[in-house]
């Protein structure tokens, strides 16, 4: 009797065991569920490190810059060209530095954008896959070289060459920095715009060829207009690289804080925001006005690059939508 | 437009794209070429006997027996140069000759007092000595050969005098004879120029051969040895043979560099053949040998990197990168895993992605500022440590910089794992976590490794973030992670811009940058190989 009872009870239990993956009892399901949630939330928290980092970067840069922003009028910061932090009556006018940054960046882009787009077209539309697979890693090498090595080249090779061959009064000048910056931003521009150009489908190309257009016409009238937002994103990303670059401009731009006069004279020395931070920070006392002013420049730089970044993301998402729609 | 013009345009366009890419590749070669080729000369070069001396003195390395034999051989050849110059100087360096004569006169006076002489004899000899001294001084100051001859003959009259036998006064006659001999040969009006030029030659010889045997050893290591490299020796030889001058062409015109042969300047003197002698015997004096100085990569250096290698810099760079990898690898892989495998596509995830992209776009100098403000000035004091830049803070700063690189690469790697793998695992009853850990992660491992190596190479090359958070240009090898360190990247900067001494050793300047570039490029090459292998494996080609 007892045995039969046990059998009767045991039988359904064995049945349950068979189907265990499918039918869980309440506590088992809860445990697993909780485990999964707990695990996922831990993973989520760890993933949030990047968010935390961005937040902390903003917080600490603003925290250090705030006393300066309170004391000095932003109007003076943006309009005064005198950067004399060590003077008896210190002046913190960042205009010359901002202009310097824009100056080298724009000059670098004048060199880099056409070259980058031509190279991207070359990789996607002109050569065979085989040549492309050789050339692409070579161009990627340019991105791998550390910035200090570029700076070294600018100071040790390019600057003496400019001074002796081109007859400039100094080899470390805006042109030198701009040339190196354009080389440095080329890989970014090439790879992003190549992606955008390749993402324009075969259909568009083939219809254009079918209508009798040559390759040049197809590229200029069909493909580049179709890929324009990706190319704009590429240019913005390249600009970000150039604006944020420190070592090259510090070493190659000459570090003279002034607005070039005449404005087109590239052989003059200039000074950028990044170079000012790198150059001055080592010599300032922590917590001094000068120190805070450097953080204010850093904040400005951070805001500029963040805006550029959001802009590039907007353009990239537009390409993604467009190519998605085409498919 | 005609169809032919259109096709011409098309061809021109194709040519332009080719040209652009060729220009870019040429630029790459132009940048890497000189750096790498000159950098290699820090390791492979022709050394000289001075290099071997330096190696034994500073690093206790090399064969001392062999070296002392070599020293003997070279010393004999070198001595002849020193002797010639000393001889020549006897006729030129009137200032020191005058001094010498005065010293001898004083000494003679002392000797005279000790002698047993009558007052009359004493005054006689004394006045003769004074006469000799004055005559010699006149001779030294004179530019007229006849006058010199007259003075010297007058002095030499006394050379046979019994009173001067065995006294210091004999030195007068030696000097007088030497001077007359030298004065006969030299153009006396040029004495002044000669003295200056000989001084320059002596300085150059010290650079070439090191301090003179017997002279006091200079305090700094860089002055204790001559030219340690054959190329350096040759460039110094060139400076010895040719005199470079900036000559003005007239008012308002730029100065022009001219080169004149020093041998011409010294034409007719006994120094003239010396230049040929140095040129012919440079090899016997320096004994160049091809050397593979691999210890460059482990040696410490003397201040300013004048001698020695870049060992501490390499160790510092490795320490920084490996320590930052310790933070980045787990964070990066977990973030990537969460974003690809577990997260649903909602608003918060979008924010996270925007943040990661923003982090990737932050300029490297901002990371430096942040590292200074947060890690150095806030975090360290918060934990009771001294608030100073160190390896720890530098590597934390670098790890934040490398985080987006790592996350993106790992995401790509995890995404490339075919979904069939995961589906098979899920179908076998494994949960999400188990599937990820035992199926997806191993399959994505090569890709993740690529990401690790890419972020390693990024971190190794960065300079701006560690400027204020832990890098120094000079200093001891760190003994703990709470000390600052030298690194390849900061060292490269410092040697290119900050250090005047480094300008004299271009091979070491280039050597450090070349090492950094080779390190980074090798890491990248490994990453590329891994990536292609993974691609082939997963796509079954």
Please provide the spans of the model-predicted regions.
Chain B
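Transmembrane alpha-helices
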Residues: 432-470
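Membrane-interfacial helix termini and adjacent extracytoplasmic/periplasmic loops
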Residues: 37, 287-308, 343, 348, ...
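Transmembrane-helix boundary motif in ABC transporter permease subunits
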Residues: 324-356, 369, 377, 528-536
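Interhelical loop and adjacent transmembrane-helix boundary motif
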Residues: 304, 466-517
């Amino acid at each position: 009797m007892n045995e039969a009872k046990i059998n009767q009870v045991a039988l359904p239990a064995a049945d349950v065991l068979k189907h265990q993956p499918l039918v869980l009892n309440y506590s088992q399901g809860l445990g697993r569920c909780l485990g999964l949630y707990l695990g996922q939330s831990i993973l989520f928290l760890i993933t949030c490190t990047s968010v935390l980092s961005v937040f902390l970067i903003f917080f600490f840069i603003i925290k250090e810059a705030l006393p300066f922003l309170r004391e000095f009028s932003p109007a003076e910061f943006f309009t005064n060209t005198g950067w004399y932090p060590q003077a008896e009556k210190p002046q913190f006018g960042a205009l010359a530095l901002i202009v310097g940054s824009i100056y080298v960046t724009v000059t670098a882009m004048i060199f880099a954008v056409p070259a980058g787009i031509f190279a991207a077209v070359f990789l996607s539309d002109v050569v065979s896959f085989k040549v492309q697979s050789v050339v692409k890693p070579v161009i990627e090498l340019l991105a791998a070289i550390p910035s200090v090595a570029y700076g070294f080249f600018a100071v040790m090779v390019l600057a003496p060459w400019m001074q002796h061959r081109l007859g400039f009064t100094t080899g470390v000048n805006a042109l030198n920095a701009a040339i190196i910056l354009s080389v440095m931003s080329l890989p970014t521009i090439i790879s992003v715009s190549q992606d955008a150009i390749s993402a324009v489908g075969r259909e568009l190309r083939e219809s254009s060829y079918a209508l009798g257009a040559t390759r040049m016409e197809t590229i200029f009238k069909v493909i580049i207009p179709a890929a324009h937002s990706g190319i704009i994103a590429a240019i913005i990303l390249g600009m970000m690289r150039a604006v944020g670059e420190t070592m090259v401009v510090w070493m190659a731009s000459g570090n003279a804080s002034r607005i070039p006069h005449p404005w087109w004279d590239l052989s003059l020395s200039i000074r950028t925001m990044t170079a000012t931070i790198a150059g001055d920070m080592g010599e300032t006392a922590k917590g001094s006005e000068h120190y805070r002013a450097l953080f204010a420049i850093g904040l400005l730089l951070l805001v500029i690059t963040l805006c550029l970044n959001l802009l590039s993301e907007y353009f990239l998402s537009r390409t993604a939508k467009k190519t998605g729609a085409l498919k | 437009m005609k169809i032919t013009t259109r096709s011409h345009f098309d061809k021109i366009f194709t040519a332009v794209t080719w040209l652009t890419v060729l220009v870019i590749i040429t630029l790459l070669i132009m940048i890497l070429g000189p750096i790498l080729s000159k950098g290699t000369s820090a390791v492979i070069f022709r050394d000289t006997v001075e290099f071997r001396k330096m190696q034994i003195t500073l690093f206790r390395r090399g064969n001392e027996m062999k070296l002392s034999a070599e020293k003997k051989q070279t010393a004999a050849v070198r001595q002849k140069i020193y002797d010639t110059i000393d001889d020549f100087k006897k006729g030129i360096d009137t200032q020191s000759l005058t001094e010498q004569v005065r010293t001898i006169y004083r000494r003679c006076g002392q000797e005279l007092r000790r002698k047993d002489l009558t007052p009359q004899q004493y005054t006689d000899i004394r006045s003769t000595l004074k006469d000799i001294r004055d005559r010699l001084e006149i001779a030294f100051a004179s530019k007229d050969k006849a006058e010199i001859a007259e003075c010297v003959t007058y002095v030499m009259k006394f050379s046979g005098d019994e009173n001067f036998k065995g006294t210091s006064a004999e030195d007068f006659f030696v000097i007088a004879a030497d001077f007359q001999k030298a004065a006969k040969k030299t153009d006396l009006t040029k004495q002044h120029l000669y003295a200056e030029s000989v001084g320059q030659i002596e300085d150059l010889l010290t650079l070439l051969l090191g301090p003179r045997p017997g002279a006091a050893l200079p305090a700094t290591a860089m002055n204790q040895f001559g030219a340690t490299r054959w190329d350096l020796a040759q460039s110094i030889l060139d400076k010895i043979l040719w005199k470079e001058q900036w000559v003005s062409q007239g008012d308002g015109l730029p100065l022009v560099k001219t080169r004149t042969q020093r041998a011409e300047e010294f034409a007719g003197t006994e120094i003239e053949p010396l230049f040929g002698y140095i040129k012919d015997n440079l090899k016997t004096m320096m004994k160049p040998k091809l050397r593979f100085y691999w210890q460059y990569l482990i040696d410490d250096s003397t201040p300013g990197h004048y001698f020695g290698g870049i060992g501490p810099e390499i160790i510092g760079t490795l320490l920084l990168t490996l320590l930052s990898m310790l933070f980045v690898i787990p964070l990066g892989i977990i973030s990537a895993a969460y974003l690809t495998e577990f997260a649903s596509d909602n608003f918060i995830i979008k924010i996270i992605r925007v943040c990661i992209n923003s982090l990737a776009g932050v300029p490297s100098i901002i990371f430096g500022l942040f590292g200074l403000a947060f890690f150095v000035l806030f975090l360290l004091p918060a934990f009771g440590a001294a608030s100073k830049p160190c390896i720890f803070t530098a590597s934390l700063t670098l790890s934040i910089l490398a985080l987006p690189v790592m996350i993106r690469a790992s995401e790509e790697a995890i995404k490339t794992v075919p979904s069939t793998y995961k589906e098979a695992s899920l179908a076998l009853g494994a949960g999400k976590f188990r599937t990820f850990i035992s199926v997806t992660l191993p399959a994505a491992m090569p890709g993740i490794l690529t990401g690790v190596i890419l972020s390693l190479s990024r971190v190794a090359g960065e300079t701006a973030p560690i400027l204020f958070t832990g890098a120094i240009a000079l200093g001891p090898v760190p003994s703990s992670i709470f000390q600052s360190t030298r690194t390849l990247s900061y060292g490269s900067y410092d040697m290119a811009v900050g250090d005047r001494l480094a300008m004299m050793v271009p091979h070491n300047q280039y050597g450090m940058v070349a090492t950094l570039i080779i390190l980074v490029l090798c890491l990248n090459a490994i990453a590329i190989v891994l990536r292609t292998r993974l691609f082939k494996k997963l796509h079954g080609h």
